[in-house]
């Protein structure tokens, strides 16, 4: 849906690395979004066992269960053969926020002053969780404004959805369980405002 894919998103960043520093690309076993990396570090989870965020996977990596998860090896290989080869080292499943990513490790419990073994949630993006905090519900648009702006809506998963040109994705469970999360907006808003101030 939406018909767009940003240079800021998952596969664009990986492809950029492959083209500007192939040695780094070749040295990497897999790739993680920051929101997946932090819970993995806090829970001392191996890279091949990280529970990937549905929010990040769906909105930035084109993950959709109806399409067998991430884009196929063949699709990615059309962009670059090495990107296609990477597909097997990525992931098959994604999880909504609220699902356990694991338990807080002893090391991080000590550093943070928290009890060892408490649950650490699978992550979601700041705007999507901000929409939850702002009371997003069907029929209500929430606009999150910061370094970017995101317009977040939800629609029950039982409803048929139509293609909406220009949005950043429709992802099952990316905002609330049992709802599609719909995201639109403008990236780099804070940087653009800063540019205007300086110029």
Where on the chain are the PLM-derived regions?
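Gly/Ser/Thr-rich active-site cleft segment
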Residues: 2-124
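Catalytic phosphate/nucleotide-handling subdomain of diverse soluble enzymes
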Residues: 110, 114, 118, 123-199
